[in-house]
Each structure stands twice: as structure tokens, then as C-alpha cells.
Amino acid sequence: MSSGKHGKSGKIIFLKVLSGKILEYLPSKTIFSQGEQCKDVHYIEQGVVKLVLVSQRGRSGVLGFLGRGDFFGEACIGGHAIYQTSAITMVPSKILVIERKKMIHLIEKEPHVCTQFINYLLSRNHRIEQDLIDHLFNSSEKRLARVLLLLNDYEKGNENPSIIEFVNQDTLAEMIGTTRPRVNFFMNKFRRLGYVHYTHNGGLQIYKSLSKVLQ
């Protein structure tokens, strides 16, 4: 769901914005809600965030998932008065909050940063389109594999399997839009194939070989 290219661009911008406020969130916490005043840009230092849209009829849908190195809430830069979606953490997350004025100042004073940020936004929009296609046409097994790879940041160049301790099967089922029994079935399959490993304390280790499921 994320590419190394725009992840690096986001990191460059982040390094230039050191005066932001860092907030830490537990899983399932709302960072901002749809309809709230749109006044800050957010950058994910650590964690996974889902963007949720609620229709006028009250139906909700997940627009996409964001991981380390991603921005969200950037609509405030373009003059949007309210957030068009809600942002909710899926795992423990560390978020850098950048004031709108500071972000605009950075973009105006650093032309190359402006170019990088535009490229990032275009890449991010393309990824959200791919997420929607994924939900509409791909199997639950492939959606689960993509989410697990996102959790370990493999798509941003990380080569080593880290241990994920805060994601249960109910959360994974919510993330990919299926049931817990289906997630359990696929997780057992991934374990038998050596794509994932459960640690003695209940943590989950995800191996890059899981990407074979997406082929």
C-alpha cells in the first residue's frame, strides 16, 4: 500500500519539519473525525491509520490504509474547512502533527520540497485507487497479505521481519472486510507455508516471502 519512492519523499519533508507536535495513540483511537475543522497536516512516524468515510445515509467505508512515512489531513493546505474522512489508528501509532501555516510556509519557501510533496500526493492517490480495486476485485487472502506486508513496512524497503504485538485477528478482519474465521483460516495457511510465525508471547512475525501470495 506504500512505495519506497514516496516514502522517501515523505521522510525528506519530515526531516525539514522538526517543530511539529508528536502524539502517541493506542489502537482504535480517532485522530480526527469527518466534519471536524481541518487545520493540521499529519505524518505517521510509526503505526497504521485507516481513513473512513461515512455517507449521508450513514453507511461507512474504508478508503485506504496508511503506514509509516505517509501524510494525511493534507486537504487543509488547499483551503478545505473540514476533514472529509475520519482517521483511526489500527495499531499503536506515533503521529507528527504539523500546523497548516507551517506546512504552507515550507512548501512556499522550498520549491523542491513542494515538488516532492505533490509527487507524494499523486502517488498516494494512486495507491488509494489500488486499495479500492483490491477491495472490489481481489480475494480476502490477497487483501490480508497486503495488510500484513504493510504492517512490516516491506513496501518501504524494510528487509527484516519485525514482531507485531498489537494486531489480533478481529482487527485484521476489520481491515480487509471479512470475518475472523476467514482470517484464522488464511493465517494458519500462511504459517504452514512459513510466511508468518507466532512467537511464544503471542507476537506475529511477518516474512517478506508472504509477497508470493500477491503474485
Q: Residue ranges of each PLM-predicted region?
A:
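A cytosolic small-molecule/anion-sensing beta-strand core signal
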Residues: 26-27, 45-46, 67, 91, ...
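Phosphate-/nucleic-acid-contacting segments
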Residues: 153-215
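Polybasic "coupling" helices that flank or enter modular domains
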Residues: 108-177
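Local beta-strand/beta-hairpin segments that build beta-sheet-rich folds
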Residues: 31, 63-64
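Cyclic-nucleotide recognition modules
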Residues: 12, 18, 64-126
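Regulatory nucleotide-sensing modules
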Residues: 4-46
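Glycine- and acidic-residue-biased ligand/ion/polar-headgroup-sensing regions
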Residues: 39-52, 57, 67-69
